[in-house]
Structures are given as C-alpha cells and as structure tokens.
C-alpha cells in the first residue's frame, strides 16, 4: 500500500493538498449555526443519489408517470424508502437553506469583500426553490397537475411578454405532456448541473476569503 501511495504522492502531492485542507484557520466565534450550509450540501447530495435511483423506474409521460411512482412505492425493493428519503431531504434542504440565509444575513456575511459569495448564494436559493416547483409536478397527480397549472400561469399577468412566457414554460398553450417533459428535464439535468456549478463557485470563494468575522 505504501508503494501505491508513494506513486500517487510523487505525481499529485496528495499530502500537500491534505495539509492545505486541514490547516485552514477557523475563527473562534464559529458555532453550530455555521454548519447550516454544509447540511444543505449534504441534503443536495442525498437528493442526487436518491433521485438518480428513481430515474431507473420513473416514466415522464402523462399516462405513465403516476403509475410509475406507485410502482416505485409498492413494487420496487426499498423504493418506498428511497422516495421517502428524497422527499424528506428535499424539505430539509429548503429549511436548512432558509436558516443558512438568515444566519449569513444576521452575522453580516454578505458584506465586503463577500458580495459575490452572497450573490451565488441567492442564485442557489432560487435554484433550490425551482427544484421544489419542478419536482412537485413529476408524480403527475391532481396536486402536481394543478400546482403546475397555477405556477406556470402566474407570468400571464406580465404585460406584453406574459402569454409567450407562459407558453415557453408549458411547452404549449395548455399544461400537458410538453410541460411534464420540460419540468422533468429541468429537475433531473438542468437544475442539478447549474446547482453544482454555483455550489463550486460558492465554496471556492468561501475557501479563498475564509469565514466572516463576528459583528
């Protein structure tokens, strides 16, 4: 094992990377509330794992979506547990994100020189809410259908661009297969990719600037 480690160490300088990660200064005022961002990240990773598992059985069509969710819950081994963990971690992610935003705001973590860190955090908050909206529709039950119809109908009130925007969201003039396809694509590909990119930016800036000091 030591020879294998030495081989990688010679090429990648693993020890130097580990020392840099573990030697980062942590201010003495840091408490448990500073862990809320990390908990949000953990919930996101759980979402990715459980969501990926469900894609093997879920069918994004208006005729089969609800039946496929029922199949996951009743027929698939541990499907009920995977979907339940997905739902619970989704709620936990939203809650932890809200508490994290409040903590950062109340402790002044958005002030100079951390404005861009705050901006990426706000973008991540919007993406988190978007996960909730798109994921809520995927079972395509009565609640999901009418939730999508209401949410996608909100932009109708915007002058000039309202109607085209509604059609863009729905994929057609009314809620249907095109809407479900778009929401599924957003929920399983577009939003996770954007979230991963902005999380990386967020963490790199935190790593560079460090944790904000006390008020």
UniProtKB/Swiss-Prot annotation:
Residues noted as binding heme c in the record, renumbered to the chain: 35
CDD domains: Cytochrome_b_N
Ranges that cross the membrane: 32-52, 90-110, 116-136, 186-206
Residues that coordinate or bind heme b 2: 86, 187
Membrane topology of this protein: Multi-pass membrane protein
Residues at which heme b 1 binds: 100, 202
Free-text comment on the cofactor: Binds 2 heme b groups non-covalently with two histidine residues as axial ligands. Binds one heme group covalently by a single cysteine link with no axial amino acid ligand. This heme was named heme ci.
Gene3D superfamilies: Cytochrome Bc1 Complex, Chain C (1.20.810.10)
Principal location: plastid
Function: Component of the cytochrome b6-f complex, which mediates electron transfer between photosystem II (PSII) and photosystem I (PSI), cyclic electron flow around PSI, and state transitions.
Note: Heme 1 (or BH or b566) is high-potential and absorbs at about 566 nm, and heme 2 (or BL or b562) is low-potential and absorbs at about 562 nm.
Stated family: Belongs to the cytochrome b family. PetB subfamily.
Quaternary state and interactors: The 4 large subunits of the cytochrome b6-f complex are cytochrome b6, subunit IV (17 kDa polypeptide, PetD), cytochrome f and the Rieske protein, while the 4 small subunits are PetG, PetL, PetM and PetN. The complex functions as a dimer.
Record's protein name: Cytochrome b6
Gene, per the UniProt record: petB
């Amino acid at each position: 094992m030591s020879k294998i480690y030495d081989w990688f160490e010679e090429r990648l300088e693993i020890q130097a990377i580990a020392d840099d990660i573990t030697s980062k200064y942590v201010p003495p005022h840091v408490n448990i509330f500073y862990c809320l961002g990390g908990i949000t990240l953990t919930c996101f990773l759980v979402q990715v794992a459980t969501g990926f598992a469900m894609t093997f059985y879920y069918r994004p069509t208006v005729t089969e979506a609800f039946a496929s969710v029922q199949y996951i819950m009743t027929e698939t081994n541990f499907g009920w547990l995977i979907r339940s963990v997905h739902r619970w971690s989704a709620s936990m992610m939203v809650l932890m994100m809200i508490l994290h935003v409040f903590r950062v705001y109340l402790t002044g973590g958005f002030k100079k020189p951390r404005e861009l860190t705050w901006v990426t955090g706000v973008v991540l908050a919007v993406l988190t809410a978007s996960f909730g909206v798109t994921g809520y529709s995927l079972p395509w039950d009565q609640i999901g259908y009418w939730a999508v119809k209401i949410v996608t109908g909100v932009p109708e009130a915007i002058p000039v661009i309202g109607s085209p925007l509604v059609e863009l969201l729905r994929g057609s003039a009314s809620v249907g297969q095109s809407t479900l396809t778009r929401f599924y694509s957003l929920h399983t590909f577009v939003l996770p990719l954007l979230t991963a990119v902005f999380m990386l930016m967020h963490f790199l800036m935190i790593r560079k600037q460090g944790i904000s000091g006390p008020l």
